[in-house]
Amino acid sequence: LSYRHNGQQDFALYTSARFKAVRGDKAKIIAEMEEISDKREDSQPVKSRTGGSTFKNPDGADPEGLKAWKLIDAAGCRGLRVGDAQVSEQHCNFLINHGVATAQDLETLGETVRQRVLDHSGVTLHWEIKRMGEAHA
């Protein structure tokens, strides 16, 4: 087991789960949850329409090293737009739908980002978002 692998098939669909909770001080737990939530709001576009983190961090990326968002930013993609789809200004590993972006807009934007990162750094980014079907113009 690891961050990205749980020993199950990639296409497995989970319909329920059972969690084992550990008892703790309620006030401390609430404070920690609020701190985590505040950090996410400060660093990610949580109030925007996104599919979440768009690209996986490159294999072998250490916690302080090579990150997809850093590669995207270095390739000049922060704020890049196709139609109503945009690379987030706040965290550039998120693609935002500003209202009427089509699947084709998002696909084109994502592939443009991948190509620019490859051209700039030699690193191929892999989609983290599971795309289904085909995007049509």
PLM regions with names:
Residues 1-108, 115, 119-137:
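Phosphate/pyrophosphate- and phosphate-bearing ligand-binding catalytic cores of soluble enzymes
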